[in-house]
């Protein structure tokens, strides 16, 4: 039986995807020791935008800090801290922070770790999907 666990996001090592975006897997199956809803903290640098993508499963964004635009197909939503965005399967989406001088931080929620391509990048680079700042 899996044990409960406290995760402090400040102690989770960010995975640097590129010079514009970093990602922290806060909650995932490996971390929890059982199947869970996956939670990721993403940081998009000021004056940047993501490349965008399409996923097979629903994804949910929660905006933590910063303001920006989230595009879902041809629809643009201006978002602020406290907003949620529901991204249905098959929807092309990206984040545009090019008009802002501050970082854009969001939490992403999805059902299975395999539905997020950064999971595989972490596994390839680290041999696992989660690291603390104290690990090499």
Where are these regions (language model features)?
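Short beta-strand His + acidic residue motifs that chelate non-heme Fe in jelly-roll/DSBH
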Residues: 51-52, 70-71, 87, 93-100
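A short, N-terminal "cap"/entry segment at the start of jelly-roll beta-barrel domains
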Residues: 1-36, 122-136
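Short acidic-glycine-tyrosine-enriched beta hairpin
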Residues: 74-90
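Conserved short histidine dyad/triad with adjacent acidic residue
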Residues: 39-55
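A generic beta-sheet turn/junction motif
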Residues: 30-32, 56, 72, 99
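A short hydrophobic beta-strand segment most commonly corresponding to one strand
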Residues: 36-39, 60, 86, 101-119
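Glycine- and acidic-residue-biased ligand/ion/polar-headgroup-sensing regions
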Residues: 58-59, 63-68, 73
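A cytosolic small-molecule/anion-sensing beta-strand core signal
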Residues: 40, 64-65, 81
